[in-house]
């Protein structure tokens, strides 16, 4: 378990054959290794059901559909549109407004459990991570960036 991005920076991809027919990513996680490997076919797997649903999402929907859904949720819930560190904001009320918008959207997600909303939530959650409590509710706090 861990961040494979560091391994990629250290040259992991260069260790792979140049012509890969089928790349099997058994413990894919974020799929960063798969996304940085050229192959004719990919098999991506992970034990986490939420990640599996994301893999299906990316296969099922085109980028514009996903982006339009994210934009609609940003507008609907008043989520931050700009990418700004919270500590750079002069207006402290704006920080609270964005934090409350995130919490409202998180609450909505926990009631409806839509994978497109799950993906959107991760943009705004702390360190773009996800975590669930014992009841299965998404419980990551709002991230340090207003839009991450």
Which sequence ranges carry the predicted segments?
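S-adenosyl-L-methionine
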Residues: 1-27, 32-33
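Class I S-adenosyl-L-methionine-dependent methyltransferase module
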Residues: 40-148
């Amino acid at each position: 378990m861990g961040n494979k991005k560091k391994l990629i920076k250290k040259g992991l991809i260069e260790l792979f054959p140049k012509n890969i027919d089928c790349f099997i990513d058994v413990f894919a996680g974020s799929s960063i290794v798969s996304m940085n490997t050229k192959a004719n076919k990919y098999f991506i797997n992970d034990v986490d059901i939420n990640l599996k649903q994301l893999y299906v999402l990316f296969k099922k929907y085109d980028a514009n559909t996903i982006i339009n859904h994210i934009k609609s949720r940003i507008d609907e819930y008043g989520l931050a549109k700009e990418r700004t560190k919270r500590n750079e904001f002069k207006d402290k009320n704006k920080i609270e407004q964005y934090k409350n918008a995130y919490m409202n959207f998180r609450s909505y997600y926990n009631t409806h459990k839509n994978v497109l909303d799950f993906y959107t939530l991760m943009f705004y959650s702390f360190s773009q991570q996800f975590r669930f409590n014992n009841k299965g509710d998404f419980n990551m706090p709002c991230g340090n960036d207003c839009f991450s």
